[in-house]
């Protein structure tokens, strides 16, 4: 016996049976150990042989283990010597002899298994008693190998290669494990047309990720199963090639090629009845190419050209262009079938078709409004992915979320139980006290506890009943699904009696029971129907865009948005109204969906509230005044600085980092973008804004389209500020506007100005405005001091003093801020550090003659 003539798997079995004997403290290595090792081998070849003969591998394993337990254990200090029994060596010799007689160059595991049938010990008897003899086994091996000889050390890897390295899609269709395919008739028809050709009958499905390329293959498999295809394809089977399994473990040079050749050989022998489906077709180019070896695509080319291999590929347009088109010889052997993104209407039909599968899996119900919302909202708000994939993901996640909620305790009941635990803890603590107040408290808490426990018991009973009803409905859905699969099978096999029983008896009965089980009280504790609001909530979490159903409180808030913004911005009613209208349009869903929510050019002198209004708007929308992207346009005075906004071009440093503007909007699609002091930027920068303002999108340096449709864009400028500063009381507003617009038109191109929603003038602040701003500024200071437990008070004289001294029509409110810092904050800081003002003090500010006085009240 030459151990080198055994395959790698056979050597592994021999090593394992030796380890088994040592592990069990047996002195001899017996054929029984060899049989046990064979039954546990990982390739599945022995199991396939036993199943073919009609044996039961689990029964064999139990019998072998029973006999192994009977062998006496011998334990010797320091480790005893273990040796091969004569019978074991005889079996291995016999396996070599069988392999040689069969024309094999190497001894494989099935030859060792065959040799065991000639064994006269207990191992051979177990096989004989289970109906496994040498004659049956030889026939099964011949069927398994399909006439192939074991001529390599990895011969077992080439047996039944299609089953090992592929997935039978047609079999999945037969077992009802594929989702129904709605639409895509044209693409399936085109694929069938190419497959029916005499030569080069290999379609390649090309389309964006998520449009349903693999679904077309599943649809074709279902049509083959239902015989809804031309005669040439009726007996075909679609096998999906697993390239990962093909490559995995191919450690020796040439092993990958042998595996692939074994797959191709089986396909060739099938006489055109096997259609090979290769997902991610571009992976074939270069796969297996090491040190001059041929890659997978070169192995396929001859068979593809001769029409011996029916192959369907699937890849994206970018990868087809990058890998397949570069290899012209490979590209010409495939016929492209372009798969486009389905429309929203088609997506709704697809979702309705797969609805039952998701309801069955998640044990929930999906409303039709949820399906429509998933298609329309995903198309509108998730712009970097494709239909129907993104819509299906929304349905799946919404169902998953509801399933988790159904399996956990209802929130109302959970809060009740927590309150009961809290009361019990309080009672335990109060029982240690003897005073009268504690006794009264114990009495009141005990009464409350009784009421809550009674309520909890009732709710718990109701919850369990509802849960039981849902579980019953789920079981009925599973039975209904299985009955429908059985009906299809019965109709296909022409078993009319069974088909009639299922169609007119069993299925209607299950449906009636299911209808009764689903008639749950809408006011129950459990909600099992996925609605439109659930889909909107999922999109809000994914994108950050608040499109979930507005609460009545928010509706009221949006109607008074002007009042909220006026609390921060004084004297700019026209600007506030324009911005407020834009927000209301967006939140009510009636704005143009192909443009940003609003685009404004704020014109006015410094310090009148242009930037402040933008911050106030961000604060209103996000409850955070700093939740806006602020881009200071004075940093973009050079032409080349455009690359900072959209990313550096290929070949430059920072190409892979993205742009300041595009990356921010990609990560947070719903935000306020402030381009501050736009007149200072290079004029070429405004050219990239044209498509943002008009189409609501921008392509960055990497070719990724960024969606700006959910942003509010604000541009601020000081152009024409001199005119607005010198504007007299009661002067014609239209005349002033025309003069300012002359300055604006001299700087900005008409196509840029024409794309803005509104150009808003910020007028200079008057004394009354400054008086109101003083209140706001001191109010902010009051809040800061309150954090240190210091109360700040000021009278009307102090307000008038600050308004008079802080008023400068040319500089707006900014001098006022500096005045408050100089006159109040500096003095307060000194007094706090000196210990004159401490926590709990009240500080009163009033005017005394021509200055402010700060008085401390304990």
From Swiss-Prot:
PROSITE patterns: CLP_R, CLPAB_1, CLPAB_2. Signal peptide: none annotated. The keyword Ligase does not apply. ATP 1 binds at residues 207-214. Residues 84-147 are annotated as: Repeat 2. It is found in: Cytoplasm. Its main location: cytoplasm. It holds the Pfam family AAA_lid_9. GO terms for molecular function: ATP binding; ATP hydrolysis activity. Residues 6-71 are annotated as: Repeat 1. Residues 554-764 are annotated as: NBD2. ATP 2 binds at residues 604-611. Residues 160-341 are annotated as: NBD1. Keywords: ATP-binding, Chaperone, Coiled coil, Cytoplasm, Nucleotide-binding, Repeat, Stress response. Residues 392-523 form a coiled coil. Residues 765-858 are annotated as: C-terminal. Belongs to the ClpA/ClpB family. PANTHER family: ATP-DEPENDENT CLP PROTEASE (PTHR11638), HEAT SHOCK PROTEIN 104 (PTHR11638:SF18). The Clp repeat (R) domain probably functions as a substrate-discriminating domain, recruiting aggregated proteins to the ClpB hexamer and/or stabilizing bound proteins. The NBD2 domain is responsible for oligomerization, whereas the NBD1 domain stabilizes the hexamer probably in an ATP-dependent manner. The movement of the coiled-coil domain is essential for ClpB ability to rescue proteins from an aggregated state, probably by pulling apart large aggregated proteins, which are bound between the coiled-coils motifs of adjacent ClpB subunits in the functional hexamer. This is Chaperone protein ClpB. It comes from Rickettsia prowazekii (strain Madrid E). The gene is clpB.
């Amino acid at each position: 016996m030459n151990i080198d003539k055994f395959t790698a798997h056979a050597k592994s079995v021999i090593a394992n049976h030796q380890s088994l004997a040592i592990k069990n403290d047996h002195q001899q290595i017996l054929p029984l150990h060899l049989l046990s090792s064979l039954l546990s081998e990982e390739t599945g070849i022995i199991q396939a042989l036993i199943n073919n003969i009609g044996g039961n591998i689990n029964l064999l394993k139990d019998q072998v283990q029973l006999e192994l337990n009977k062998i006496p254990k011998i334990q010797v200090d320091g480790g005893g010597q273990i040796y091969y029994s004569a019978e074991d060596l005889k079996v291995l010799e016999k396996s070599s002899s069988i392999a040689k007689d069969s024309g094999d160059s190497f001894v494989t595991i099935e030859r060792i298994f065959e040799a065991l049938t000639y064994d006269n010990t207990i191992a051979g008897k177990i096989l004989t008693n289970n109906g496994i003899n040498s004659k049956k086994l030889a026939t099964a091996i011949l069927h398994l190998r399909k006439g192939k000889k074991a001529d390599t050390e990895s011969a077992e890897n080439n047996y039944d290669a299609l089953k090992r390295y592929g997935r039978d899609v047609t079999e999945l269709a037969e077992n009802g494990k594929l989702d129904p395919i709605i639409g895509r008739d044209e693409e399936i028809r085109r694929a069938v047309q190419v497959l029916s050709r005499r030569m080069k009958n290999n379609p390649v499905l090309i389309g964006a990720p998520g449009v349903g390329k693999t679904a077309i293959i599943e649809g074709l498999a279902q049509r083959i199963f239902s015989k809804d295809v031309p005669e040439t394809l009726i007996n075909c089977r679609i096998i999906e090639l697993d390239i990962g399994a093909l490559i995995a473990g191919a450690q020796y040079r040439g092993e990958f090629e042998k595996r692939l050749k074994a797959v191709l050989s089986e396909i060739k022998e099938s006489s055109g009845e096997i259609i090979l489906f290769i997902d991610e077709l571009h992976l074939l180019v270069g796969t297996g190419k090491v040190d001059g070896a041929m890659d997978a695509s070169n192995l396929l080319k001859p068979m593809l050209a001769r029409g011996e291999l029916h192959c369907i590929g699937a890849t994206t347009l970018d990868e087809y262009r990058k890998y397949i088109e570069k290899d012209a010889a490979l590209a010409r052997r495939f016929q492209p079938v372009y798969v486009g993104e389905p429309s929203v209407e088609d997506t709704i039909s697809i979702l309705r078709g797969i609805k039952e599968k998701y309801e069955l899996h998640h044990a929930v119900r999906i409303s039709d409004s949820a399906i429509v919302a998933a298609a329309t909202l995903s198309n509108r708000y998730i712009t970097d992915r494709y239909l129907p994939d993104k819509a299906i993901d929304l349905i799946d996640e919404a169902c998953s979320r509801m399933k988790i909620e159904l399996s956990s305790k209802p929130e109302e009941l959970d809060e009740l139980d927590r309150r009961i635990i809290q009361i019990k803890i309080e009672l335990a603590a109060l029982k240690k006290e003897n005073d009268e107040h504690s006794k009264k408290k114990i009495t009141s808490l005990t009464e409350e506890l009784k009421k809550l426990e009674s309520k909890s018991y009732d709710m718990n009973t109701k919850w369990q009943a509802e849960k039981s009803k849902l579980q019953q409905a789920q079981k009925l859905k599973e039975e209904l699904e299985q009955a429908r699969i059985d009906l299809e099978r019965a109709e296909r096999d022409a078993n009319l009696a069974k088909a009639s029983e299922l169609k007119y008896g069993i299925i209607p009965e299950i449906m009636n029971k299911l209808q009764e089980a689903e008639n749950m009280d809408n006011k129950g504790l459990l909600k099992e129907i996925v609605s439109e609001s659930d889909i909107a909530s999922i999109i809000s979490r994914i994108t950050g865009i608040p499109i979930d159903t507005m609460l009545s409180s928010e509706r009221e808030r949006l109607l008074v948005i002007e009042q909220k913004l006026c609390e921060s911005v004084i004297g700019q009613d026209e600007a506030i109204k324009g911005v407020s209208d834009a927000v209301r349009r967006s939140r009510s869903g009636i704005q143009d969906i192909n443009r940003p929510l609003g685009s404004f050019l704020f014109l006015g002198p410094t310090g009148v509230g242009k930037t402040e209004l933008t911050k106030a708007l961000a604060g209103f929308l996000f409850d955070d005044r700093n939740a806006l992207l602020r881009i200071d346009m004075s940093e973009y005075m050079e032409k080349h600085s455009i690359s900072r906004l959209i990313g550096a071009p290929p070949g430059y440093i920072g190409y892979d980092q993205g742009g300041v503007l595009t990356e921010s909007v990609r990560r947070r699609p719903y935000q306020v973008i402030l381009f501050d002091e736009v007149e200072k930027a290079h004029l070429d920068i405004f050219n990239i804004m044209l498509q943002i303002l008009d189409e609501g999108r921008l392509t960055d340096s990497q070719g990724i389209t960024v969606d700006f449709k959910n942003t509010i864009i604000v541009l601020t400028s000081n152009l024409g500020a001199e005119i607005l500063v010198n504007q007299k009381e009661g002067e014609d507003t239209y005349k002033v506007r025309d003069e300012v617009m002359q300055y604006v038109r001299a700087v900005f191109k008409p196509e840029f100005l024409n794309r803005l929603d509104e150009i808003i003038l910020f007028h200079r602040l008057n004394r009354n405005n400054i008086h109101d701003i003083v209140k706001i500024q001191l109010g902010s200071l009051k809040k800061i001091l309150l954090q240190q437990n210091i109360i700040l008070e000021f009278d009307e004289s102090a307000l008038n003093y600050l308004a008079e001294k802080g008023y400068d029509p040319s500089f707006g409110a900014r001098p006022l801020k500096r005045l408050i810092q100089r006159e109040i904050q500096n003095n307060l800081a000194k007094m706090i550090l000196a210990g004159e003002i401490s926590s709990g003090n009240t500080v009163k500010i009033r005017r005394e003659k021509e200055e402010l006085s700060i008085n401390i009240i304990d």
